[in-house]
Amino acid sequence: MKRLLLWAALPLLLLSCTEKIHDPGKDNKGPVEGELIAINGFYTLEHEGFKFKIREEEYNTAAAQSAIALLKENFEEINSLLPKSALDVMHKNPIWMERNLTDGAAWYHTSKEWLESQGYMTEKWHCVELCNFVHYVSWTKQNQPYMVLHELCHLYHDLALPGGFENPDVKAAYNHAMAAGLYVNTPYRLDKDTVIQHYDDYYHAKVYATTNQMEYFSEICEAYWGENDYYPFNYEDLKAYDPQGFALMEKVWGKRDK
């Protein structure tokens, strides 16, 4: 599991946790952007076409403000990288922010039934969620700078590609990579200064891209557009190491300006 980054397409892979809607109370409102009004305990904000929601009682905390500032930076970079057609899809559904709903950092919710069965808010269906925005900040700064992009690519894969998560082009590239053993014991970036050469041996675990075609897709999207913590780390690595995955990226997103 990618540093406990959790993805909600396969319910059995997710942590079980009961969602509770907190009473927003009256003591921690303070100044907010514009004339924001909390609905069902959440403020809805917008930046660069992206909408995001955060609990009223969390908004003015230092941790939340740090997460919001970083999220806005992520939005700006994503808007500068991706084609408008993809951004139009990604801008539609809000990103939800929770302080510590789980001990992961971010996930994408593809199943309304699973959300309901776990006691989570079904309004989060087809949305990306920062399920622990404290971890989101620290892990993004440590070695996962494109965490939000990764989750948004799950959303795009699910909602925009023909066949959704069963898209045949994605499955073909994934199956080829798995058959070729491309994502076995590859290097991993622990932080900006440290790369371990053999992930499987170091962690006694499998490289995250091997999980399924959904994680493979979002992992190579990180490499194509920016930087991944797992090898291939970037555009040039992906092009040289996994040509079929690279061709998939160009087919899905179009050729990228280097």
Residue ranges and their predicted role:
Residues 1-4:
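Positively charged n-region of N-terminal signal peptides that target proteins for export
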Residues 6-10:
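Sec-dependent N-terminal signal peptides
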Residues 15-16:
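C-terminal motif of bacterial Sec signal peptides marking the signal peptidase cleavage site
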Residues 23-46:
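N-terminal low-complexity, Pro/Thr/Ser-rich intrinsically disordered segments
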Residues 44-65:
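Acidic/histidine-rich, surface-exposed loop or edge segments in extracytoplasmic proteins
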Residues 55, 63-179, 246:
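Acidic/His-rich structured neighborhood in mature extracellular/periplasmic domains
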Residues 122, 172-258:
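Metalloprotease/metallohydrolase-associated module, dominated by Zn2+-dependent proteases
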